[in-house]
């Protein structure tokens, strides 16, 4: 299962949004990978170091790929984090 999402938080996937993203990814029975939409490389969404290491900024598109029993629920929750302004998180 795969989705492409535009990152809305002003700081991109850094600090607080990344922390919430990783925490949420770890709650599901799913293997979730994340990468820039225009690149093939993916990193584990459950790794803070990997997620922040991508350096994804505001208004950039990312690709989420998930497998497992909770794949769709995980993608829904992670998409919600990425498409919500940080002030509302």
Curated annotation (Swiss-Prot):
The keyword Transport applies. It is found in: Cytoplasm. Induction: Expression is highly up-regulated in presence of fructose. The modification Phosphoserine is found at residue 47. The active site is at residue 14. The keyword Transport applies. GO terms for cellular component: cytoplasm. Transmembrane segments: none annotated. InterPro entries: HPr, HPr-like, HPr-like_sf, PTS-HPr, PTS_HPr_His_P_site. It comes from the Archaea. Residues 1-89 form the HPr domain. Keywords: Cytoplasm, Phosphoprotein, Phosphotransferase system, Sugar transport, Transport. Phosphorylation on Ser-47 inhibits the phosphoryl transfer from enzyme I to HPr. General (non sugar-specific) component of the phosphoenolpyruvate-dependent sugar phosphotransferase system (sugar PTS). This major carbohydrate active-transport system catalyzes the phosphorylation of incoming sugar substrates concomitantly with their translocation across the cell membrane. The phosphoryl group from phosphoenolpyruvate (PEP) is transferred to the phosphoryl carrier protein HPr by enzyme I. Phospho-HPr then transfers it to the PTS EIIA domain. Is involved in fructose transport. PTS-type transport systems are very rare in archaea. This is Phosphocarrier protein HPr. It comes from Haloferax volcanii (strain ATCC 29605 / DSM 3757 / JCM 8879 / NBRC 14742 / NCIMB 2012 / VKM B-1768 / DS2). The lineage of its organism: Archaea, Methanobacteriati, Methanobacteriota, Stenosarchaea group, Halobacteria.
């Amino acid at each position: 299962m795969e989705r492409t999402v535009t990152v809305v938080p002003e700081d991109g996937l850094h600090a607080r949004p990344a922390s919430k993203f990783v925490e949420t990814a770890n709650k599901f029975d799913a293997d979730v990978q994340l990468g820039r939409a225009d690149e093939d490389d993916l990193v584990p969404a459950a790794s803070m170091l990997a997620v922040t290491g991508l350096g994804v900024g505001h208004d950039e598109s990312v690709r989420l790929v998930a497998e497992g029993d909770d794949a769709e629920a995980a993608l829904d929750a992670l998409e919600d984090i990425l498409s919500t302004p940080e002030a509302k998180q």
